[in-house]
């Protein structure tokens, strides 16, 4: 008997095997009925506000750190390099905000806060096309508004310190930047799938682990690895919002990396989880044979 099965007594005294978890049905590709549901628009609003707050806190942290460590601005000379929250603090800001916001919005919208996450879940048929598109639009608009708030509150420093925009660091090729974004987003989306897997939830129901916790830690760890390369995108809305508000040439030069990389990473993670770990291809083949 496989690990996915438990033994239950049948009505006739026999025994039969049944799953100890239930997979939700696949979301329809297009669900027109969703457009008449308030729950959809409530979820879209939640994604907008969550992404706005995410960009506001994280970009403000980046700008503040750069100001604190600017020797010419602080007058601290060589000691300025030891000031501020540091790269570790920036990574904590991103990971911590994801933990908080996913916890707050998971029951309303699923807590995506990232077009790459939404795209991966759409490919896995966890959300419909209508919901996925509305989420992505809301996330991008929320990101622009969030960075806009940072510029409004820190207008003296926003442009001077790069507006928190992602760009390819000097010394790295476009291939290296693209690869870093693909791998980083794969780690994040793979963690999302694993943390929300109904099989894991059934087996680990006795362990009080919140799904937002590993997701936030994944964001934290990826930032530590990727900040020196691209400033860490792994979220097209985050990269777009900062690029739009900052609106200088450098962030736009290689902006495609921060869309292509995360979307590819999300697609690979969705395929790996659904068709390798969850054996989706084998299940589909078995269903085809049984119906033949």
Curated annotation (Swiss-Prot):
GO cellular component assignments: membrane; plasma membrane
Bilayer-spanning residue ranges: 43-63, 82-102, 133-153, 175-195, 207-227, 257-277
InterPro entries membership: Aquaporin-like, Aquaporin_transptr, MIP, MIP_CS
Q: Which branch of life, at top level?
A: Eukaryota
Please list where the region (Disordered) is annotated.
1-20
One Pfam family this chain carries? MIP
The record places the motif (NPA 2) at 235-237
Keyword set, alphabetical order: Cell membrane, Membrane, Repeat, Transmembrane, Transmembrane helix, Transport
| Motif interval(s): NPA 1 | 114-116
Report the GO molecular function annotations: water channel activity
SUPFAM superfamilies cross-referenced by the UniProt entry: Aquaporin-like
Q: Where in the cell is it found?
A: Cell membrane
Q: Which CDD domains match?
A: MIP
Q: How does it sit in the membrane?
A: Multi-pass membrane protein
Function comment: Aquaporins facilitate the transport of water and small neutral solutes across cell membranes.
| Stated family | Belongs to the MIP/aquaporin (TC 1.A.8) family. PIP (TC 1.A.8.11) subfamily.
Name of the molecule in the record? Aquaporin PIP2-2
Q: Provide the organism lineage as a comma list.
A: Eukaryota, Viridiplantae, Streptophyta, Embryophyta, Tracheophyta
């Amino acid at each position: 008997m496989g690990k996915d099965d438990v033994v239950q007594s049948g009505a006739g005294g026999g025994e039969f095997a049944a799953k100890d978890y239930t997979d939700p049905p696949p979301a329809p590709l297009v669900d027109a009925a969703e457009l008449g549901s308030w729950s959809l628009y409530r979820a879209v609003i939640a994604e907008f506000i969550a992404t706005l707050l995410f960009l506001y806190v994280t970009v403000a942290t980046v700008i503040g750190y750069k100001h604190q460590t600017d020797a010419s601005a602080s007058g601290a000379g060589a000691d300025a390099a030891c000031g501020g929250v540091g790269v570790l603090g920036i990574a904590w800001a991103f990971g911590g905000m994801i933990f908080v916001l996913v916890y707050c919005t998971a029951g309303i919208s699923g807590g995506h806060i990232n077009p790459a996450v939404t795209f991966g879940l759409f490919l896995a048929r966890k959300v419909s096309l209508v919901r996925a598109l509305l989420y992505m639009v809301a996330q991008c608009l929320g990101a622009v508004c969030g960075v806009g708030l940072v510029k409004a509150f820190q207008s003296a420093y926003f442009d001077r310190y790069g507006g928190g925009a992602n760009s390819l660091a000097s010394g790295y090729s476009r291939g290296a930047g693209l690869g870093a974004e693909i791998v980083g987003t794969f780690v994040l989306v793979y963690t999302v799938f694993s943390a929300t897997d109904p099989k894991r939830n059934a087996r680990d129901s006795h362990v009080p682990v919140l799904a937002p916790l590993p997701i936030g830690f994944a964001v934290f760890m990826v930032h530590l690895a990727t900040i020196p390369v691209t400033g860490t995108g792994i979220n097209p809305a985050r990269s777009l919002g900062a690029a739009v508000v900052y609106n200088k040439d450098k962030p736009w030069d290689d902006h495609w990396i921060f869309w292509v990389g995360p979307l590819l990473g999300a697609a690979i993670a969705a395929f790996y989880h659904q068709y390798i770990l969850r054996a989706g291809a084998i299940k589909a083949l078995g269903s085809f044979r049984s119906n033949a």
